[in-house]
Amino acid sequence: MRDTMLDERTKKVLYAVVESYIEKPEPVGSRYIMKKYGFDVCSATIRNIMSDLEDAGFLSQPHTSAGRVPTDKAYRFYVDYIFQSELFSQSLEIKRVIENLTKKLRKLRNNMNSLFLETTQSLSQATRYLGLALLPATEKTALHRVDFIKFKDDLVIAVVVNDKGIVKNKIIKVYPEITQKELNSLADFVNRNYHGKTIDEIRDDLIVRIKKEKIFWDRLISKILKMCQEALYFSREDVYVSGFYHIMHLPDFSDIEKLREVAKTIQDRHLLLKLFENISEDDEVKVIIGQENPVEEFRSFSIIASPYKEKDKSLGVIALVGPKRMNYQRAIMLVNAFARSLTRTLSD
């Protein structure tokens, strides 16, 4: 049975079950629903509706005599219902959280590491879930300065600073004959010709130059340009995670083994990057629930994510990771508001 095939009463019962379970992680009974939500039918009718919802895969019954709990399918219905009904209204408390965050971010705008650390910590503090932020991909940022430092005969440290103030170091292999003086000249060439251009633009131009030099100039120039190209290639690896302390106290993670599993998952940078790869950087908040996640290790969680930008250019993503039994209305509003606040800070 699809959501669109549910009648209005059934939808209201399903919404009530999910909302009740989010508020209190105990199986929900028909009598409780009837009293709390004031349904004008008897508890037996509600029980029959809940039984039909179980058959349709929206609810499950942990014990024969117990009430029902939502499945991933029920949480998806609940989230879609929230969006369709536009059940979003910022409370005074949420407005204060955003105002305080905006003030803090303005003070930190010249220190990207502190900026994103503050964002994830504040997001986690406000929700009691894990706050995550994927920093801007190096390719999307503009070059501020590059320096080359000879480390060993055939090794050079490339120090790349982008327009966001993020510093990247990389060790690259070079031909042994190159001197520090030549490296300084090379850095001057890059800084003079490519300052303010994105790393992608620089690499594209270097590829063209390398092809030309192979035809017209000597191999030495080609090698130098290849070294520049390698120096400007970085894998995307900067992910900030805050709030493990908060989820430790959620009843959803009271099992010590489950908590260890969570800790192992969020410490795996490869998995975190894989998670972000599956979140498109469009204009909308995205909610991924349990089994919907293509990354198997995250199927015990729900993810709420939103892109942040600099003006109209998407730079990265911020996200919440929490239990499927999540306060979706509040979490969606906060993630959306945090992303907008970060965008304003980066765009001003």
Curated annotation (Swiss-Prot):
Keywords: Repressor, Stress response, Transcription, Transcription regulation
Classification via InterPro entries: GAF-like_dom_sf, HrcA, HrcA_C, WH-like_DNA-bd_sf, WH_DNA-bd_sf, WHTH_transcript_rep_HrcA_IDD
GO biological process terms, semicolon-separated: negative regulation of DNA-templated transcription
Superkingdom, taxonomy of origin: Bacteria
Disulfide linkage: none
Pfam families named in the record: HrcA
GO molecular function annotations of the record: DNA binding
Functional summary from the UniProt entry: Negative regulator of class I heat shock genes (grpE-dnaK-dnaJ and groELS operons). Prevents heat-shock induction of these operons.
Alphabetical list of HAMAP family matching this protein: HrcA (MF_00081)
Family: Belongs to the HrcA family.
Protein name as catalogued: Heat-inducible transcription repressor HrcA
UniProt organism field: Thermodesulfovibrio yellowstonii (strain ATCC 51303 / DSM 11347 / YP87)
